[in-house]
Curated annotation (Swiss-Prot):
PROSITE patterns: TRP_SYNTHASE_BETA (PS00168). Keywords: Amino-acid biosynthesis, Aromatic amino acid biosynthesis, Lyase, Pyridoxal phosphate, Tryptophan biosynthesis. This is Tryptophan synthase beta chain. Its EC number is 4.2.1.20. It comes from Thermosynechococcus vestitus (strain NIES-2133 / IAM M-273 / BP-1).
Length: 410
Protein backbone atom coordinates (compact mmCIF):
# COMPACT_ATOMS: atom_id res chain seq x y z
CA UNK A 1 0.00 0.00 0.00
CA UNK A 2 1.37 3.43 -0.92
CA UNK A 3 0.21 6.71 0.54
CA UNK A 4 0.64 9.91 -1.41
CA UNK A 5 1.90 13.05 0.32
CA UNK A 6 -0.99 14.87 2.00
CA UNK A 7 -3.01 17.05 -0.30
CA UNK A 8 -3.33 20.80 -0.07
CA UNK A 9 -5.22 21.84 3.02
CA UNK A 10 -8.12 24.23 3.37
CA UNK A 11 -7.51 27.55 5.04
CA UNK A 12 -9.17 26.31 8.23
CA UNK A 13 -6.65 23.52 8.67
CA UNK A 14 -3.34 25.14 7.82
CA UNK A 15 -1.22 27.92 9.34
CA UNK A 16 -1.46 31.24 7.54
CA UNK A 17 1.54 32.99 6.00
CA UNK A 18 2.66 34.10 9.47
CA UNK A 19 2.52 30.56 10.77
CA UNK A 20 -0.64 31.08 12.80
CA UNK A 21 -3.55 28.77 13.52
CA UNK A 22 -6.10 31.40 14.44
CA UNK A 23 -4.52 33.25 17.36
CA UNK A 24 -2.01 30.47 18.05
CA UNK A 25 1.44 29.68 16.69
CA UNK A 26 3.72 32.30 15.17
CA UNK A 27 7.47 32.93 15.63
CA UNK A 28 8.51 34.30 19.02
CA UNK A 29 12.26 33.74 18.75
CA UNK A 30 15.55 35.65 18.96
CA UNK A 31 16.43 37.60 15.83
CA UNK A 32 19.40 35.28 15.25
CA UNK A 33 17.01 32.38 14.56
CA UNK A 34 14.73 34.14 12.08
CA UNK A 35 16.97 33.45 9.04
CA UNK A 36 17.25 29.77 10.00
CA UNK A 37 13.47 29.44 10.34
CA UNK A 38 12.96 31.18 7.00
CA UNK A 39 15.56 28.88 5.39
CA UNK A 40 13.81 25.83 6.84
CA UNK A 41 10.39 27.01 5.69
CA UNK A 42 11.67 27.64 2.16
CA UNK A 43 13.46 24.28 2.01
CA UNK A 44 10.36 22.44 3.18
CA UNK A 45 8.12 24.27 0.69
CA UNK A 46 10.52 23.30 -2.10
CA UNK A 47 11.32 19.70 -1.22
CA UNK A 48 7.79 18.62 -0.32
CA UNK A 49 7.07 19.13 -4.04
CA UNK A 50 10.35 17.58 -5.22
CA UNK A 51 9.88 14.11 -6.78
CA UNK A 52 13.39 12.93 -5.83
CA UNK A 53 12.93 13.96 -2.19
CA UNK A 54 9.53 12.29 -2.00
CA UNK A 55 10.82 9.13 -3.68
CA UNK A 56 13.69 8.83 -1.19
CA UNK A 57 11.39 9.53 1.77
CA UNK A 58 8.77 7.01 0.65
CA UNK A 59 11.40 4.34 -0.05
CA UNK A 60 12.93 4.76 3.42
CA UNK A 61 9.53 4.82 5.13
CA UNK A 62 8.77 1.51 3.44
CA UNK A 63 12.10 -0.33 3.61
CA UNK A 64 13.75 1.21 6.69
CA UNK A 65 10.86 2.21 8.95
CA UNK A 66 8.58 -0.64 7.89
CA UNK A 67 5.52 1.32 6.79
CA UNK A 68 2.63 1.00 6.45
CA UNK A 69 2.05 0.18 10.10
CA UNK A 70 -0.85 -2.27 10.61
CA UNK A 71 -4.36 -1.33 11.71
CA UNK A 72 -5.03 -4.11 14.21
CA UNK A 73 -8.47 -5.14 15.48
CA UNK A 74 -8.18 -5.52 19.26
CA UNK A 75 -10.78 -8.26 19.64
CA UNK A 76 -10.42 -8.99 23.35
CA UNK A 77 -10.10 -5.32 24.29
CA UNK A 78 -13.28 -4.64 22.30
CA UNK A 79 -15.10 -7.46 24.11
CA UNK A 80 -13.91 -6.08 27.45
CA UNK A 81 -15.81 -2.83 26.83
CA UNK A 82 -18.94 -4.39 25.31
CA UNK A 83 -22.24 -4.18 27.22
CA UNK A 84 -25.95 -4.22 26.41
CA UNK A 85 -25.91 -0.85 24.65
CA UNK A 86 -22.55 -0.93 22.89
CA UNK A 87 -20.24 -3.35 21.12
CA UNK A 88 -17.25 -1.16 20.32
CA UNK A 89 -14.92 -2.17 17.52
CA UNK A 90 -11.51 -1.01 18.76
CA UNK A 91 -8.56 -0.84 16.37
CA UNK A 92 -4.94 0.02 17.14
CA UNK A 93 -2.82 1.91 14.64
CA UNK A 94 0.43 0.09 15.36
CA UNK A 95 3.05 2.85 15.32
CA UNK A 96 4.82 0.82 18.02
CA UNK A 97 5.88 -1.59 15.26
CA UNK A 98 7.90 1.05 13.40
CA UNK A 99 11.69 0.80 13.47
CA UNK A 100 12.80 2.24 16.87
CA UNK A 101 9.41 1.45 18.41
CA UNK A 102 7.35 4.62 18.04
CA UNK A 103 5.89 7.16 15.65
CA UNK A 104 8.81 9.53 16.19
CA UNK A 105 10.93 8.18 13.34
CA UNK A 106 8.48 9.52 10.71
CA UNK A 107 9.48 13.08 11.59
CA UNK A 108 13.14 12.38 12.36
CA UNK A 109 13.63 10.78 8.96
CA UNK A 110 11.90 13.58 7.08
CA UNK A 111 13.83 16.31 8.88
CA UNK A 112 17.22 14.61 8.43
CA UNK A 113 16.57 14.32 4.69
CA UNK A 114 15.76 18.05 4.68
CA UNK A 115 18.87 18.88 6.74
CA UNK A 116 21.09 16.93 4.34
CA UNK A 117 19.77 18.92 1.40
CA UNK A 118 20.29 22.15 3.36
CA UNK A 119 23.96 21.23 3.88
CA UNK A 120 23.76 20.77 7.67
CA UNK A 121 26.20 18.23 9.11
CA UNK A 122 25.29 18.53 12.80
CA UNK A 123 21.91 17.54 14.20
CA UNK A 124 20.52 18.38 17.64
CA UNK A 125 17.26 17.36 19.27
CA UNK A 126 15.46 17.34 22.60
CA UNK A 127 13.84 14.26 24.07
CA UNK A 128 11.62 13.38 27.02
CA UNK A 129 10.70 9.70 26.87
CA UNK A 130 13.76 9.14 24.72
CA UNK A 131 11.88 7.90 21.66
CA UNK A 132 12.48 11.07 19.63
CA UNK A 133 16.12 10.99 20.71
CA UNK A 134 16.48 7.35 19.68
CA UNK A 135 14.77 8.01 16.34
CA UNK A 136 17.00 11.02 15.65
CA UNK A 137 20.17 9.15 16.67
CA UNK A 138 19.10 6.24 14.47
CA UNK A 139 18.61 8.33 11.35
CA UNK A 140 21.83 10.29 12.00
CA UNK A 141 23.71 6.98 12.20
CA UNK A 142 22.12 5.91 8.92
CA UNK A 143 23.38 9.07 7.20
CA UNK A 144 26.65 9.62 9.08
CA UNK A 145 25.69 12.90 10.75
CA UNK A 146 26.93 14.25 14.10
CA UNK A 147 24.13 13.99 16.68
CA UNK A 148 23.62 15.65 20.08
CA UNK A 149 20.50 14.86 22.12
CA UNK A 150 19.46 17.09 25.04
CA UNK A 151 17.65 15.22 27.81
CA UNK A 152 16.61 16.24 31.31
CA UNK A 153 18.38 14.41 34.12
CA UNK A 154 15.08 13.23 35.62
CA UNK A 155 14.07 11.78 32.26
CA UNK A 156 17.49 10.16 31.86
CA UNK A 157 16.86 8.33 35.13
CA UNK A 158 13.34 7.30 34.10
CA UNK A 159 14.40 6.23 30.63
CA UNK A 160 17.83 4.65 31.14
CA UNK A 161 17.25 2.08 28.40
CA UNK A 162 16.75 4.78 25.77
CA UNK A 163 19.82 6.69 26.99
CA UNK A 164 21.91 3.57 26.39
CA UNK A 165 20.30 3.06 22.99
CA UNK A 166 21.17 6.61 21.90
CA UNK A 167 24.78 6.24 23.00
CA UNK A 168 25.10 2.87 21.26
CA UNK A 169 23.88 4.59 18.09
CA UNK A 170 26.74 7.07 18.37
CA UNK A 171 24.86 10.10 19.70
CA UNK A 172 26.09 12.36 22.47
CA UNK A 173 23.43 12.57 25.20
CA UNK A 174 23.75 15.93 26.95
CA UNK A 175 22.21 15.95 30.46
CA UNK A 176 20.10 18.99 31.39
CA UNK A 177 19.80 19.67 35.12
CA UNK A 178 18.10 23.08 34.94
CA UNK A 179 14.55 23.41 36.26
CA UNK A 180 13.07 20.00 36.96
CA UNK A 181 15.32 18.25 34.46
CA UNK A 182 12.47 17.27 32.13
CA UNK A 183 11.32 17.93 28.55
CA UNK A 184 10.76 21.69 28.82
CA UNK A 185 14.28 22.19 30.12
CA UNK A 186 15.80 19.94 27.44
CA UNK A 187 13.95 21.91 24.76
CA UNK A 188 15.21 25.22 26.15
CA UNK A 189 18.80 23.93 26.13
CA UNK A 190 18.49 22.64 22.56
CA UNK A 191 17.23 26.05 21.41
CA UNK A 192 20.21 27.72 23.14
CA UNK A 193 22.57 25.39 21.26
CA UNK A 194 20.83 26.18 17.98
CA UNK A 195 21.14 29.94 18.51
CA UNK A 196 24.90 29.48 19.02
CA UNK A 197 25.51 27.08 16.11
CA UNK A 198 22.78 28.01 13.67
CA UNK A 199 25.04 28.06 10.57
CA UNK A 200 26.11 24.41 10.83
CA UNK A 201 23.33 22.83 12.88
CA UNK A 202 19.76 21.72 12.24
CA UNK A 203 17.42 21.37 15.23
CA UNK A 204 14.98 18.47 14.85
CA UNK A 205 12.15 19.55 17.11
CA UNK A 206 10.24 16.43 18.10
CA UNK A 207 6.67 17.65 18.33
CA UNK A 208 4.13 19.92 16.63
CA UNK A 209 5.26 22.71 18.97
CA UNK A 210 7.80 25.50 18.67
CA UNK A 211 7.99 28.38 16.19
CA UNK A 212 6.69 28.23 12.62
CA UNK A 213 7.36 26.23 10.45
CA UNK A 214 7.87 23.39 12.97
CA UNK A 215 4.20 22.72 13.88
CA UNK A 216 3.33 22.46 10.18
CA UNK A 217 6.48 20.58 9.18
CA UNK A 218 6.29 17.96 11.94
CA UNK A 219 2.56 17.48 11.30
CA UNK A 220 3.20 16.88 7.60
CA UNK A 221 5.86 14.24 8.24
CA UNK A 222 3.48 12.45 10.64
CA UNK A 223 0.39 12.84 8.42
CA UNK A 224 1.25 9.46 6.90
CA UNK A 225 -0.34 7.94 10.05
CA UNK A 226 -3.79 9.34 9.27
CA UNK A 227 -3.46 8.83 5.52
CA UNK A 228 -2.70 5.14 6.03
CA UNK A 229 -5.50 4.87 8.59
CA UNK A 230 -8.06 6.25 6.12
CA UNK A 231 -6.99 3.78 3.44
CA UNK A 232 -6.92 0.85 5.88
CA UNK A 233 -10.39 1.69 7.22
CA UNK A 234 -11.76 1.82 3.69
CA UNK A 235 -10.17 -1.55 2.96
CA UNK A 236 -11.45 -3.17 6.18
CA UNK A 237 -15.05 -1.92 6.31
CA UNK A 238 -15.54 0.51 3.47
CA UNK A 239 -15.94 3.63 5.58
CA UNK A 240 -14.33 6.02 8.03
CA UNK A 241 -13.82 5.49 11.77
CA UNK A 242 -16.33 7.01 14.16
CA UNK A 243 -13.77 8.08 16.76
CA UNK A 244 -10.02 8.73 16.73
CA UNK A 245 -8.21 8.60 20.06
CA UNK A 246 -4.62 9.64 20.81
CA UNK A 247 -2.52 10.85 23.71
CA UNK A 248 -1.37 14.48 23.73
CA UNK A 249 1.80 15.92 25.21
CA UNK A 250 3.21 18.25 22.59
CA UNK A 251 0.78 16.48 20.29
CA UNK A 252 2.65 15.04 17.29
CA UNK A 253 1.19 11.54 17.25
CA UNK A 254 -2.33 12.90 17.70
CA UNK A 255 -1.91 15.47 14.94
CA UNK A 256 -0.46 12.83 12.64
CA UNK A 257 -3.61 10.76 13.12
CA UNK A 258 -6.13 13.63 13.22
CA UNK A 259 -4.89 15.70 10.27
CA UNK A 260 -6.36 13.49 7.56
CA UNK A 261 -9.79 13.67 9.23
CA UNK A 262 -10.05 17.28 10.44
CA UNK A 263 -12.47 18.08 7.62
CA UNK A 264 -14.57 14.95 8.16
CA UNK A 265 -17.01 16.33 10.77
CA UNK A 266 -18.59 12.92 11.38
CA UNK A 267 -15.28 11.65 12.82
CA UNK A 268 -14.78 12.57 16.49
CA UNK A 269 -11.22 13.61 17.36
CA UNK A 270 -10.30 12.98 21.01
CA UNK A 271 -6.96 13.86 22.58
CA UNK A 272 -6.02 12.61 26.04
CA UNK A 273 -3.64 14.54 28.29
CA UNK A 274 -1.86 13.54 31.48
CA UNK A 275 -3.79 14.37 34.66
CA UNK A 276 -0.80 13.11 36.67
CA UNK A 277 -1.66 12.90 40.34
CA UNK A 278 -4.97 14.70 39.72
CA UNK A 279 -6.12 17.95 38.11
CA UNK A 280 -6.59 19.62 41.49
CA UNK A 281 -3.16 18.68 42.86
CA UNK A 282 -1.04 20.93 40.66
CA UNK A 283 0.95 17.84 39.66
CA UNK A 284 -0.30 17.21 36.12
CA UNK A 285 0.39 18.03 32.46
CA UNK A 286 -3.19 18.77 31.33
CA UNK A 287 -2.38 21.90 29.34
CA UNK A 288 -5.54 22.06 27.24
CA UNK A 289 -7.74 21.27 30.24
CA UNK A 290 -6.22 23.65 32.78
CA UNK A 291 -3.92 25.98 30.83
CA UNK A 292 -4.06 29.62 29.77
CA UNK A 293 -2.80 31.23 26.58
CA UNK A 294 0.86 32.24 26.60
CA UNK A 295 4.17 31.90 24.76
CA UNK A 296 6.65 29.05 25.21
CA UNK A 297 9.48 27.86 22.98
CA UNK A 298 8.65 30.28 20.20
CA UNK A 299 4.90 29.81 19.81
CA UNK A 300 1.65 31.05 21.33
CA UNK A 301 -0.48 28.24 22.70
CA UNK A 302 -2.14 27.03 25.87
CA UNK A 303 0.37 26.70 28.74
CA UNK A 304 0.40 25.72 32.38
CA UNK A 305 1.06 29.04 34.16
CA UNK A 306 0.87 30.55 37.61
CA UNK A 307 -1.00 33.74 38.55
CA UNK A 308 1.99 35.82 37.42
CA UNK A 309 2.11 34.20 33.99
CA UNK A 310 5.20 32.13 34.76
CA UNK A 311 5.29 28.66 33.21
CA UNK A 312 4.87 26.02 35.92
CA UNK A 313 6.34 22.55 35.98
CA UNK A 314 4.30 19.71 34.55
CA UNK A 315 4.03 16.21 36.01
CA UNK A 316 3.25 12.85 34.46
CA UNK A 317 4.43 9.31 35.08
CA UNK A 318 4.99 9.38 31.31
CA UNK A 319 8.14 11.29 30.37
CA UNK A 320 6.76 11.96 26.89
CA UNK A 321 3.69 13.80 28.21
CA UNK A 322 5.55 15.73 30.92
CA UNK A 323 5.40 19.10 29.12
CA UNK A 324 3.64 22.34 30.21
CA UNK A 325 2.74 23.40 26.65
CA UNK A 326 1.04 21.91 23.61
CA UNK A 327 1.23 22.33 19.84
CA UNK A 328 -0.61 25.45 18.62
CA UNK A 329 -2.80 23.54 16.18
CA UNK A 330 -4.23 21.52 19.07
CA UNK A 331 -5.05 24.79 20.84
CA UNK A 332 -6.78 25.95 17.65
CA UNK A 333 -8.77 22.72 17.25
CA UNK A 334 -9.86 23.01 20.88
CA UNK A 335 -10.99 26.63 20.47
CA UNK A 336 -13.02 25.99 17.31
CA UNK A 337 -14.59 22.89 18.87
CA UNK A 338 -13.28 20.47 16.25
CA UNK A 339 -11.36 18.27 18.71
CA UNK A 340 -12.13 17.25 22.28
CA UNK A 341 -9.48 17.00 24.98
CA UNK A 342 -9.71 15.09 28.25
CA UNK A 343 -7.22 13.79 30.80
CA UNK A 344 -6.44 10.63 32.78
CA UNK A 345 -4.30 10.12 35.87
CA UNK A 346 -1.05 8.20 36.33
CA UNK A 347 -3.00 5.44 38.09
CA UNK A 348 -5.50 5.13 35.25
CA UNK A 349 -2.73 5.05 32.64
CA UNK A 350 -0.77 2.30 34.40
CA UNK A 351 -3.95 0.22 34.72
CA UNK A 352 -4.65 0.67 31.00
CA UNK A 353 -1.10 -0.36 30.13
CA UNK A 354 -1.46 -3.59 32.09
CA UNK A 355 -4.95 -4.16 30.66
CA UNK A 356 -3.78 -4.05 27.04
CA UNK A 357 -0.77 -6.23 27.82
CA UNK A 358 -2.93 -8.91 29.42
CA UNK A 359 -5.84 -8.77 26.95
CA UNK A 360 -3.93 -8.40 23.67
CA UNK A 361 -0.32 -9.30 24.40
CA UNK A 362 0.75 -5.77 23.44
CA UNK A 363 2.77 -3.70 25.92
CA UNK A 364 2.10 -0.03 25.06
CA UNK A 365 4.15 2.98 26.04
CA UNK A 366 2.84 4.89 29.06
CA UNK A 367 2.08 7.75 26.69
CA UNK A 368 -0.19 5.51 24.60
CA UNK A 369 -1.70 4.10 27.79
CA UNK A 370 -3.28 7.49 28.50
CA UNK A 371 -5.36 7.21 25.32
CA UNK A 372 -6.24 3.61 26.15
CA UNK A 373 -7.31 4.62 29.66
CA UNK A 374 -9.91 7.04 28.31
CA UNK A 375 -11.86 4.05 26.95
CA UNK A 376 -13.02 3.54 30.56
CA UNK A 377 -14.91 6.84 30.35
CA UNK A 378 -15.76 6.83 26.66
CA UNK A 379 -17.24 3.38 26.06
CA UNK A 380 -20.05 3.59 28.67
CA UNK A 381 -21.26 6.75 26.87
CA UNK A 382 -21.54 5.04 23.47
CA UNK A 383 -24.22 2.97 21.77
CA UNK A 384 -24.26 0.64 18.79
CA UNK A 385 -21.04 -0.59 17.19
CA UNK A 386 -18.76 2.44 17.00
CA UNK A 387 -15.42 1.95 15.29
CA UNK A 388 -12.67 3.48 17.41
CA UNK A 389 -9.09 3.87 16.18
CA UNK A 390 -6.44 4.44 18.84
CA UNK A 391 -2.96 5.56 17.87
CA UNK A 392 -0.63 3.06 19.55
CA UNK A 393 2.14 5.63 19.41
CA UNK A 394 4.90 3.56 20.99
CA UNK A 395 5.89 0.34 22.68
CA UNK A 396 6.33 0.04 26.42
CA UNK A 397 9.70 -1.67 26.84
CA UNK A 398 11.19 1.67 27.93
CA UNK A 399 8.61 1.98 30.73
CA UNK A 400 8.91 -1.40 32.44
CA UNK A 401 11.21 -0.06 35.19
CA UNK A 402 8.95 2.96 35.77
CA UNK A 403 5.88 0.75 36.08
CA UNK A 404 7.74 -1.59 38.42
CA UNK A 405 8.76 1.31 40.67
CA UNK A 406 5.17 2.60 40.60
CA UNK A 407 3.81 -0.71 41.88
CA UNK A 408 6.55 -0.96 44.53
CA UNK A 409 5.55 2.46 45.86
CA UNK A 410 1.87 1.55 46.23
Amino acid sequence: MTVAPSAALSAAARPDARGRFGRFGGKYVPETLMPALSELEAAFAHYRQDPDFQAELQQLLRDYVGRPSPLYFAERLSAHYAHDQVQPQIYLKREDLNHTGAHKINNALGQVLLAKRMGKQRIIAETGAGQHGVATATVCARFGLQCVIYMGVQDMERQRLNVLRMRLLGAEVAPVSAGTGTLKDATSEAIRDWVTNVETTHYILGSVAGPHPYPMLVREFHAVIGAETRQQCLEKWGGLPDILLACVGGGSNAMGLFHEFVEEPQVRLIGVEAAGQGLDTGHHAATLTKGEVGVLHGAMSYLLQDADGQVVEAHSISAGLDYPGVGPEHSYLKDIGRAEYYSVTDTEAVAACVRLAQLEGILPALETAHALAYLETLCPQLTGQPRIVINCSGRGDKDVETIGRYFEAQ
